[in-house]
């Protein structure tokens, strides 16, 4: 460029950010990550490379409302008003304009390729020094690993180039622009570009230089690309490593290429070649390419279970053997293919235990650091995940190396989504957009294809299905036939996918949407002519208190071989930290930054909170997906069959521990070392059990423990468990000593019952137990009344909101029927004094606008031991929406900091999400009984409860309960968890019945029929002492 054309005005006049044919100027061709080692040993050991210089750190920064507002002199010198910002970062996290959370709707008027004139612009600059070592010879490159959404680069006032696609590197040759001594970079980043039309993912829309920036020095004669292929024979005992290498800069026949393959510190193989490829066509071959091959006998194969890695070092040497440079990467020998309708890895059919993962951090936005990436992987491995889908864009380059090392199967997904288009395929069927889409697919493959963890390529997400997809599918199959391709858009089973990969298809229920029906996953397999495997690209929408019915999917996966698992939506809540006036942090979601449009709390669908603490749903995923399955075999002898679902791992680090307990009290225990081949079984004979001396239910529990630490778990990690109820020991109860019979006193408006130091008061006008005294100390702050509602879950709300009511949502049906506004009308309140007890009988009709919704009948029997037995019968009116719960509620006066119960726990569980809950006697702090969902909802239920103790109170029966400092009303009316205010005493909810939470998706009613309260009559009993 001439100096005039270097000017900011000249560059901006072209409006490259509104031209889909322009995705870059002067950007170098994509390639695997380079280090340009100058010592082969350093490359082998992946040690520090002196040829890389990080430019991360503090940069000068100025923000403008549009690129036209940027002063011309900015490219030459720092502005006096410029502040500073850390790189990498999103500038919204520093208070410059606002993050926007939108699921589908574009955050600007849809008029492709145009974007708003008011286009927030970040102006970055950095001054750094260069000595002449890098400038006298070779090439100096600058690498931006991720910039959102488009940017222009100047160096020392001269325009260098332009790049877009926020999730892949942009790399430029700076050699001609640099000078010895001080140098200045200037980077103009645009928030919106035509590329933003291809980046309409369900996530926060943020901007800036949010991945690493670095300099790389390469020699003049250099390696510019290398592609590693691993080939295995039919029985996987012989392998060939093939390295295709490209060179540039003075390539001649005197150069040597050397390939070393290392297994740890052992050299496993060596190959040599000189530049020059095989003959390609009638014009010959490439003189700047070479292929090196070496054979490996009995390779240690790579899988997520056994992530065996080799290290390939490619050396470019002179004729005299002097090293010019070396590049290297880890290698995993593995084979991926689809055969007879099954996705196979190394010949074995995979069962994908997967999750979708956005790159998100509550304080750093979309900036990923090493520790957070490792934390995510360790949590996934510890909770029995073996796969991750990079939703919906290529991830930080280090992520893939970590997945290689720790062992996760990866779906690498192109940064393409046009969900807000009408129709969705408007761009993907437009040839003008093929170049932009092509760059996003081809560059992803060129960067990432050497990673063994990547087993599937994805063409993107929710972009309909168009001719551009078909063209890119064909390119992928030609360029990399070693991996299948998946793409869900257009119906999940188009010609552009090797895998049927629906999102939110249900197990048995068809959803016959126009044009793109979602068949049940069982039906999809049997469609005429369909032979592909089915792997759900998204399922089990884990938004808030959700994830019900997850076990049902896994029953189907294990029953039908071609149902090969799926990827849960999704891994981490995308809440962001804000600070209140006192500097206290709180978790924000869509709309909390004044962002418009926004989709509220729909950004929080994670199995873990944004800080990576687990949701209760994570425990359900761990248990349902566990790699060991158990059966208690029939017969007089106690035998347990343990089946391994590992495909490649022998159980060389597992002990099975068993325990026999009665009512939470351990009677016997033992342990057995597991010795199970991949996909094998082991029968374990347990010793004769001791006979219990008292009545009560027996439970047999087995746990698989790893005695030794692994790369992803500590010693003692429990990877699988199961529990069975055994026969209940029956004993003749011993007669109890007679006590003083309770006394009934009838006063004006009250029934009072006294037994020893206990006294109960019933209101005759209302029919409620209004007070309970123990040693003259009042125990209740509110009466014990019926409860039929819950603070709505996200799944109850669906897509309903104040400006757009969905009458099919559970919450709207409950509102319309009057469940939240029903008032009790007393039908009966009577008392009777027996020889050893007092009976109080009540009946209420719960009414709304003259219609009766529920009739509740109760009998309170207070006996001579001070125990109150409550017998409850509820009749539900016909034609009503099924209730959320059938139970009782009251506010207890005393606060005790511990809760003890005999039942399912220790974590929150619901009727359709309790596979992971274990029956035992639990004792937890009161605050641990509350699940801190960012958007407050019903939470904290414990099912299958036989006994509950809280302070001096004891309850027994067969019930579900939650106990909380917050009422259902407050949970329903509060928008964020930090706004909840602890109330006096505690709220106790005891349910005889509770509806499931659902979770197949969160925008339509998804509670399976068997977990809905569809009966007309209900009966349950509670004893309170």
Swiss-Prot record:
Manner of cofactor binding, per the entry note: Binds 2 magnesium ions per monomer. Binds 1 sodium ion per monomer.
InterPro entries: B-gal_small/dom_5, Bact_Beta-galactosidase, Beta-gal/glucu_dom_sf, Gal_mutarotase_sf_dom, Galactose-bd-like_sf, GH-type_carb-bd, Glyco_hydro_2, Glyco_hydro_2_AS
Binding, Na(+): 202, 602, 605
Gene Ontology terms describing biological process: lactose catabolic process
Molecular function terms from GO: beta-galactosidase activity; carbohydrate binding; magnesium ion binding
EC number from the UniProt entry: 3.2.1.23
Residues binding Mg(2+) 1, per UniProt: 417, 419, 462
Domain of life: Bacteria
SUPFAM superfamilies given in the database record: (Trans)glycosidases, beta-Galactosidase/glucuronidase domain, Galactose mutarotase-like, Galactose-binding domain-like
GO CC annotation, single: beta-galactosidase complex
Positions annotated to bind substrate: 103, 202, 462, 538-541, 605, 1003
Keyword annotations from UniProtKB, A to Z: Glycosidase, Hydrolase, Magnesium, Metal-binding, Sodium
Cofactor(s) required, per the database record: Mg(2+); Na(+)
UniProt catalytic activity: Hydrolysis of terminal non-reducing beta-D-galactose residues in beta-D-galactosides
Active site: 462, 538
NCBIfam families registered for this protein in UniProt: PRK09525.1 (NF007074)
UniProt xrefs under PANTHER family: BETA-GALACTOSIDASE
Assembly description: Homotetramer.
Designated name of the protein: Beta-galactosidase
Organism of provenance: Salmonella arizonae (strain ATCC BAA-731 / CDC346-86 / RSK2980)
């Amino acid at each position: 460029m001439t100096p005039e054309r270097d000017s900011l005005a000249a560059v901006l006049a072209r409006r490259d950010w509104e031209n889909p044919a322009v995705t870059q100027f002067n950007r170098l061709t994509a390639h695997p990550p380079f280090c340009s080692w100058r010592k082969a040993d350093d490359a082998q050991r992946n040690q520090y490379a002196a040829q890389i210089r990080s430019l991360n750190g503090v940069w000068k920064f100025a923000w403008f409302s549009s690129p036209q507002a940027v002063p011309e002199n900015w490219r030459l010198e720092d502005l006096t008003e410029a502040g500073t910002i850390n790189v990498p970062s999103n500038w919204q996290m520093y208070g410059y304009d606002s993050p926007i959370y939108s699921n589908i709707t574009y955050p600007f008027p849809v008029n492709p390729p145009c974007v708003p004139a008011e286009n927030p612009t970040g102006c970055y600059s950095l001054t750094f020094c260069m000595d002449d070592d890098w400038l006298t010879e070779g090439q100096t490159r600058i690498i931006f690993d991720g910039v959102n959404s488009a940017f222009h680069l100047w160096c020392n006032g001269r325009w260098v180039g332009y790049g877009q696609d926020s999730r892949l590197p942009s790399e430029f040759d700076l050699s001609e622009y640099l000078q010895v001594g001080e140098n200045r970079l200037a980077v103009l980043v645009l928030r919106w570009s035509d590329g933003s039309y291809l980046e309409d993912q369900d996530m926060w829309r943020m901007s800036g230089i949010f991945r690493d920036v670095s300099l790389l020095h390469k020699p003049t004669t250099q390696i510019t690309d290398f592609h590693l292929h691993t080939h295995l024979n039919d029985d996987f005992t012989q392998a060939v490593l093939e390295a295709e290498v490209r060179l540039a800069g003075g390539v001649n026949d005197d150069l040597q290429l050397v390939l070393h393959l290392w297994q740890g510190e052992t050299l496993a193989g060596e190959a040599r070649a000189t530049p020059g490829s095989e003959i390609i066509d009638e014009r010959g071959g490439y003189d700047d390419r070479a292929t090196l091959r070496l054979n490996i006998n009995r390779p240690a194969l790579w899988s997520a279970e056994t992530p065996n890695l080799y290290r390939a070092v490619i050396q470019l040497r002179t004729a005299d053997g002097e090293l010019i440079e070396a590049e290297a990467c880890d290698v995993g020998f593995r084979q991926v293919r689809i055969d007879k309708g099954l996705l196979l890895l190394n010949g074995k059919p995979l069962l994908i235990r997967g999750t979708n993962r956005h790159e998100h951090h509550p304080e750093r936005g979309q900036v990923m650091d090493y520790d957070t990436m490792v934390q995510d992987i360790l949590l996934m491995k510890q909770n029995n995940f073996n796969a991750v889908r990079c939703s919906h864009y290529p991830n930080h380059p280090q992520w893939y190396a970590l997945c290689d090392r720790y062992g996760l199967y990866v779906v690498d997904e192109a940064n393409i989504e046009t969900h807000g288009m009408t129709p969705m395929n408007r761009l993907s069927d437009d040839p003008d957009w093929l170049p932009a889409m092509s760059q996003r697919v081809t560059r992803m493959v060129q960067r990432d294809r050497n990673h063994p963890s990547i087993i599937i390529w994805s063409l993107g997400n929710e972009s309909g299905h168009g001719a551009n997809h078909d063209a890119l599918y064909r390119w992928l199959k030609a360029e990399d036939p070693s991996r299948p391709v998946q793409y869900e858009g257009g119906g999940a089973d188009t010609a552009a996918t090797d895998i049927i990969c629906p999102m939110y298809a249900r197990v048995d229920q068809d959803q016959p949407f126009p044009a793109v029906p979602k068949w049940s996953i069982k039906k999809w397999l049997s469609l005429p002519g369909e032979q592909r495997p089915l792997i759900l690209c998204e399922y089990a929408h884990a938004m808030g208190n959700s994830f019900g019915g997850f076990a049902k999917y896994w029953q189907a996966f294990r029953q039908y071989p071609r149902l090969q698992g799926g990827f849960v939506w999704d891994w981490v809540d995308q809440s962001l930290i804000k600070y209140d006036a006192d500097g206290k942090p709180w978790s924000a979601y869509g709309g909390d930054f004044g962002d418009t449009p926004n989709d509220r709390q729909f950004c929080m669908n994670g199995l873990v909170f944004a800080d990576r603490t687990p949701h209760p749903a994570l425990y359900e995923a761990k248990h349902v997906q566990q790699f060991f399955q158990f059966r208690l075999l029939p017969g007089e002898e106690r035998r347990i069959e343990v089946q391994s679902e590992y495909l490649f791992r022998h159980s060389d680090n597992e002990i099975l521990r068993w325990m026999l307990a009665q009512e939470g009290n351990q009677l016997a225990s033992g342990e057995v070392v597991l010795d199970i081949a991949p996909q094998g079984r082991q029968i374990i004979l347990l010793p004769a059990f001791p006979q219990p001396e008292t009545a009560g239910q027996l439970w047999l529990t087995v746990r698989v423990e790893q005695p030794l630490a692994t790369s992803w778990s500590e010693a003692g990690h429990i990877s699988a468990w199961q529990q069975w109820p055994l026969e209940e020991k029956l004993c003749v109860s011993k007669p109890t000593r007679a006590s003083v019979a309770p006394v009934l006193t009838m006063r004006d408006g009250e029934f009072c019952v006294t037994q020893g130091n206990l006294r109960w008061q019933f209101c005759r006008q209302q029919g409620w137990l209004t007070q309970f005294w123990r040693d003259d100390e009042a125990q209740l702050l509110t009466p014990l009344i019926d409860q039929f509602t819950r603070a709505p879950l996200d799944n109850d709300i669906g897509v309903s909101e104040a400006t757009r009511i969905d009458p099919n949502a559970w919450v709207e049906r409950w509102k319309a029927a009057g469940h939240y506004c029903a008032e009790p009308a007393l039908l009966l309140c009577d008392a009777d004094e027996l020889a050893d007890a007092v009976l109080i009988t009540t009946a209420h009709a719960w009414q709304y606008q003259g219609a009766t919704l529920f009739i509740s009948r109760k009998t309170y029997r207070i006996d001579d031991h001070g125990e109150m037995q409550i017998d409850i019968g509820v009749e539900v009116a016909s034609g009503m929406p099924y209730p959320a719960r059938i139970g009782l509620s009251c506010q207890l006066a005393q606060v005790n900091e511990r809760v003890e119960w005999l039942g399912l726990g220790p974590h929150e569980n619901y009727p359709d999400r309790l596979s992971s809950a274990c029956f035992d006697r639990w004792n937890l702090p009161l605050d641990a009984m509350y699940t801190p969902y960012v958007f407050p909802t019903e939470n904290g239920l414990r099912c299958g409860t036989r006994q509950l103790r809280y302070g001096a109170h004891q309850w027994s029966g067969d019930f579900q309960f939650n106990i909380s400092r917050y009422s259902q009303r407050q949970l329903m009316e509060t928008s964020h968890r930090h706004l909840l205010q602890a109330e006096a005493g505690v709220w106790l909810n005891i349910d005889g019945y509770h509806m499931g939470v659902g979770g197949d998706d969160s925008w339509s009613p998804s509670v399976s029929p068997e977990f809905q309260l569809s009966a007309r009559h209900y009966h349950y009993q509670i004893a309170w002492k």
